Amino acid sequence: TALTADINTFLKVNISWQHYYPACSSAPWQIDGVAQKLKRDGFNKLIAAHNGTVVVDPIEGRENNKHQLVEDRLGLDHVVLDAPPIKWVPYRPTAKMLVLDDVYQDGLYIPEVFPGTNIVQLPTVKTHVFTTMTGALKNAFGGLLHRYRHWTHSVIHETLVDLLQIQKEIH
């Protein structure tokens, strides 16, 4: 469905490494361009969403990749999805999951702030040892699966299908 301007719109930033390596993380000019366009189109509730990994510090990555600089200049709010005050809550997809029910046998959890909002995935196009190529949908991986998302690498393609189903349900 189309984005709605009167609700929160998350810009899901990709931080693959806390050090700046071109093409590893969302480029600052990508955040700048997308946010400016959305603002011109009447989207005033923009929130940059970041997440860490088991090896990446999202606060350090936000600063080193110049995301914070752009977000501050544009007056964007930001959240770190895997740090307080953000809570992860149980979520039961209505769509049949291909693999996530098997991988996460104790249930799926998603950020409490996501349901009922818009999301714009800011992709990177890079290679990955397990996923071959990554892009916008792979970026949903960090926003919808918590710290143990690497458990899904062996079934990554099916995982991405499941995540698309969840994303369609909650955004």
Sequence positions of predicted segments:
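N-terminal and secondary-structure boundary signal
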Residues: 1-171
